[in-house]
Amino acid sequence: MKPFKLSLAAALALAVSSACAAPVVGPADDSFFTNPAPTALTGPNGDLLSYRVATVNLGAGATAVNAWNVIYKSTDSRDRNVAVSGTVLVPKAAWTGTGARPTVIYAVGTHGLASGCAPSKQLALGTDYETANIKAALAKGYAVVVSDYRGALAGATSTYLAGKAQGNAVIDSFRAAASVPNSGISLSAPAGIWGYSQGGQTAAFAAEQLSTYAPELKIVGVAAGGIPGDFFKTADYLNGSIGFAFLGSAIVGLGNQYPGQLPINLLANDEGKAALEKISTQCVFQALFENQNTNIAQYTRNGITLEELLAVESVNVTLDAQTLGRGNISVPMYQYHGQADEFIPLDQAVGLKKAYCAKSTKVKFDLYPSEHIVTQFQAAPTVLTWLADRFAGKTADSTCNTTAADPKPTANPGGGDFIVSLKSWPLNAAVGLKTLGQTVLLPATSTFTADANVTAQTLRGNLNVPDFKQTLKIIGLPIQVGLKIVPAGETTGSVSVDNAGQLKIRGTSPVDITVTSVLGIPFGECKTVSPVQFPLSFDGPISSLGNGALNFSGTTSFPLIKGCFISAILSGLMSGSGQTYSLTVSPPAPVKF
């Protein structure tokens, strides 16, 4: 019997080897992103089909990485075998923490339905709008795995917002990454899943599926923000709003995943079919800007309303299949949402938290003060700290037992312009006085309030600086000077976001500067004879709105100071050209719920 056992073992090994053939090195050109034949999809989920060394552009200051593009086997929401692409990023520097290097499985948000919008292609070009979050994870020394989801390969179609398929895709991206030669990624090392918006939905679906789809993986925590967990409420929220493109994209993506269940050709009119076809060719920002405030009744035969569409049984069943909160999550969860989110309704996110808490999931929920895009990037430091604690094996805290009332949304009304409201955002500011060679730090309680209207491309707001005292060295002596900085008019300018997610701001903030006292002696109206103009100029990724990188700096001129008997002295010390300034604006801190 012994020889038979050896033969059986050999046969089993041969079977496994045949089912999971060695991955091939793919071509260097775009033909790499070709959908493999169905016969290649016979291995286990996460089977690495092909890979290649990749070049990525993460921008200035990024951690040096080794990178690979991968194509791997996964399953979609109908349990069919599919091929999915992605990118694997591993810092070149050795991991200096305890144990093996952890991995962040990064689930991207909406990128657009066209294959050219895929993260793998955007990371190569240096145009991926989520680069800031990926860079932040790499800076911690973590490996980062990014799935493109279904649809980036030639011959494949996007299954946008098909939750089960997306959850499977990110889980299998981690499995595939561990098979990349010399990646150093280990399936036995701790890993965390992080996603926002579409990525938040993906992360939550992956978490619900872990115990059955990937019980062998050491996933220690899931961070999911801006989650569309209730598609019925989310669809109603998006319809007729600035975020209609997400609803239109969902119709296309779910129609691809569930052909026949969303009878688009039967329900859409010619205008609707053309609009959905165009959305299929666009990346996220172009689709967003070109489809604002559309009502789905414009695109349906006989003006069928959203409510009537959702009553169609096959449509209802399809959307219901994307509902979260019904599965158990066995790992800690960090959930977060923007109180002013204009795309994903807050109440259904709160409901999802309660559903998970009721199933004994350990959920920590943070409420961020701003809108959807800002929150995505503002939350990154907190997410990474939370994940670091999970990787370190620390006990996760929970806000499931909060007695606080449900938070109320503060989003700008739907159906209007796309406005990012900066309500009393902390202002970290400094002014450099050229003649004195010294820097004046504005009070830590200074704030900036503005409405950045991306639709109208206008910026309107004001600085708020409390009166303060600053010690300056004058002729070598430390002298305390009282200062008042007040708006001399509204901060005005222009703001725009291009199709690549690049933010551009141009404007001016005029202020009057008054010297209120010297050595404690009050001087009344000893102020600049005309307003000081602080030019506001910024060019950078839209992530800067949330991650603290929104900075306006440069040089300006201070007019003469008049109104008191030492005006001439103060003018000599503080007036003239070449004065420098730095104004950094960041959103307020979140609150627990």
Each model region followed by its residue ranges:
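Catalytic-loop region of hydrolases
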Residues: 21-99
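Accessory cap/linker subdomain of secreted extracellular hydrolases
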Residues: 37-38, 228-326
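Short, surface-exposed "cap/lid" segments of acyl-processing enzymes
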Residues: 76-85, 89-139
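Alpha/beta-hydrolase active-site loop
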Residues: 133, 160-182
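Primarily recognizes the serine-hydrolase "nucleophile elbow" in alpha/beta-hydrolase
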Residues: 176-245
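Short beta-strand/loop motif that positions the catalytic acidic residue
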Residues: 193, 329, 334-341
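C-terminal catalytic histidine-bearing segment of alpha/beta-hydrolase fold enzymes
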Residues: 316-317, 334, 343, 350-419
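Extracytosolic secretory-pathway proteins
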Residues: 409-593
